[in-house]
Amino acid sequence: MTLQDIADQLGYSKNTISLALRNSPQIPQGTKEKIQRAASQLGYRPNAIVSRLMAELRSSQKSKFQAKLALLNANDDPNAFTSHPTIPIYVEGCHRRANQLGYSFDSFWIQDTAMTAKRLIQIFKTRNIKGLVVVGLMGGNQLPSRLNSLWESFPVVVTGVRTRNPTLSFACVDHHMLTLRAVERLIELGYKRPALVLDDSIDLLVERRFSAGFKTGQVRLEDQNRIPPFLKYKQAKADPRIFKSWILDSKPDVVLTLYNSVSTWIQELGWQVPEDIGFAQLERRPESPQFAGMDQHNDIAGEAAVDMVISQIHNNESGIPKFPRATLIGATWTGSKSILSPLTDVPAAKPSA
């Protein structure tokens, strides 16, 4: 079945059929749907090799920068792209992949209430911006509702978390597998009472995938060694007695967390890391090489987001998707001196009250 066969069947030109099957905006939506439906019923399948060669040909005929993309800072901090401990890693990956593919980025802070959707759309069209990558959403999983028309007008992908209202395609680390693998690794090293220390708001942001992965890993432990997650980081930061009471009562032999400050809390109680208790990071960073833990590879999530949005551009896809897509990045364990490896008969720490 060829394009000409479909054209003969439907009474359109071959060029119209080709544009409709590529979802071109030049063809009315009703006509596109009619042609796409008929092509599917007739058994048409595009030749993958020819499609790739044509894409390469079109690419080679364009200038060095095919088009611009917008990198949208969704964080409350307008300087988060440089000042935040995590967000710059996503940004680095976004820029690296965009440059590899011949695109460049313009950056915008979308929490500026003076910047309306209408104004942004006007700017993006003036600058020939074709797609949007959202970075830095940390305080919740909802984007500003005042920008709804923006998400309807462009290809858009979110990094770091999955959003709701609107629900958009996203790329991020696999939070469930990240925590599960960390627990499994600690058990392999001989730890028997791992504990998870987080803030409830962070666990909620990722729809409980941190605690779910942790609890899944605990299945391998004896019932009496399954310590419930401690999700009161913010409260404990304000009142250290909360953490002290919990850790004395729970008696973990290793702590998993996102916060380096928890290591300080432990040492202030008179515990030695790793001699008395192990310490592992769920987001290991280059500036803290002394901590063992999981490398999230958030730069790769940034790269994946760029790949996804460029795919949307090539396929003429825009707006809030009916079926949002996800790319999950695998995390890897890196050992360091905060964990005893291999663990040899080290009891849970017993600090003085």
Give short role names for the model-derived ranges:
Residues 70-71, 128-137, 157, 195-198, ...:
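Periplasmic-binding protein-like
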Residues 169-196, 237-244, 296-317:
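Hydrophobic alpha-helical segments within soluble ligand-binding/sensing domains
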Residues 1-58, 353:
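N-terminal helix-turn-helix DNA-binding module of bacterial transcription factors
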Residues 182-221, 319-340:
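An alpha-beta-alpha
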Residues 98-111, 166, 194-197, 208-240, ...:
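Short beta-strand elements in bilobed, periplasmic/extracellular small-molecule ligand-binding domains
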Residues 4, 42-121, 130, 200:
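Amphipathic helical "hinge" segments at domain boundaries
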Residues 135-178, 279-292:
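Flexible loop/hinge segments that line or gate small-molecule binding clefts
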Residues 245-353:
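Flexible loop/turn connectors
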